[in-house]
Amino acid sequence: MEKLEMIYEGKAKKVYRTDNPDFYWVEYKDDATAFNGQKKGTIDNKGVVNNKVSAVFFKLMESKGITTHFVELVNDREMIVKALDIIKVEVVVRNIVAGTLAKRVGLPEGTILPKTVLEYYYKDDNLGDPLINASHIAALDLATPEQMAFIKETALKVNDIMREYLAPVNIDLIDYKLEFGLHKGQVLLGDEISPDTCRFWDKTTGEKLDKDRFRRDLGNVEGAYQEVLRRLTGEA
């Protein structure tokens, strides 16, 4: 497959056309942003880690019957994916209170939620990706009720799969963001699953192994990302 012109550059990835219109070529960047682009920086080899970690999780999902956009890794920093028409709803799944949820509901970070919380955000950088609900999604015609039912069911399945997978490597899945899109009319799991889009805490120490180290100036961001990759793949 041949890599052609770039068609999109986001905060974390570049997307290129290929000589097959059904597939895109994705390059993961080292650029880091937080607070909807208000804070910017660079994390050495972040793109490499996120590419490889995403591949691990996408392959895991496929093995459990969840269809994703992932096709194959090209190299350390790039992968081939199915071309998606992105659904403009970001799905956040929360198991333990952290980040904005702590501020919104007044519970301390680290509080275990008795039930998994699902949140929907309108994927629009200009608006700051605001929190929305099912009524907003219907009114804005962002997705059909059937698509949202499938997305909700899939997001919860992903949660069960990831928590079970991460437990033996001593990682707690605090929360994470998923994106979905349409490929030939079918809803697929897209974007990435990485320390950029998930909160990973060490089960024993509570050490943060994700982008919160960048957001909160905790230091050793590169080391935390590499540690996640090491635990998942054994790769240093």
From Swiss-Prot:
It comes from the Bacteria. Coiled coil: none annotated. It is an enzyme of class 6 (ligase). Belongs to the SAICAR synthetase family. CDD domains: SAICAR_synt_PurC (cd01415). GO terms for biological process: 'de novo' IMP biosynthetic process; cobalamin biosynthetic process. This is Phosphoribosylaminoimidazole-succinocarboxamide synthase. The keyword ATP-binding applies. Pathway: Purine metabolism; IMP biosynthesis via de novo pathway; 5-amino-1-(5-phospho-D-ribosyl)imidazole-4-carboxamide from 5-amino-1-(5-phospho-D-ribosyl)imidazole-4-carboxylate: step 1/2. Its EC number is 6.3.2.6. GO terms for molecular function: ATP binding; phosphoribosylaminoimidazolesuccinocarboxamide synthase activity. Transmembrane segments: none annotated. The keyword Transcription does not apply. InterPro entries: SAICAR_synt/ADE2_N, SAICAR_synt_PurC, SAICAR_synth, SAICAR_synthetase, SAICAR_synthetase_CS. It catalyses: 5-amino-1-(5-phospho-D-ribosyl)imidazole-4-carboxylate + L-aspartate + ATP = (2S)-2-[5-amino-1-(5-phospho-beta-D-ribosyl)imidazole-4-carboxamido]succinate + ADP + phosphate + 2 H(+). Keywords: ATP-binding, Ligase, Nucleotide-binding, Purine biosynthesis. The gene is purC. It comes from Desulforamulus reducens (strain ATCC BAA-1160 / DSM 100696 / MI-1) (Desulfotomaculum reducens).
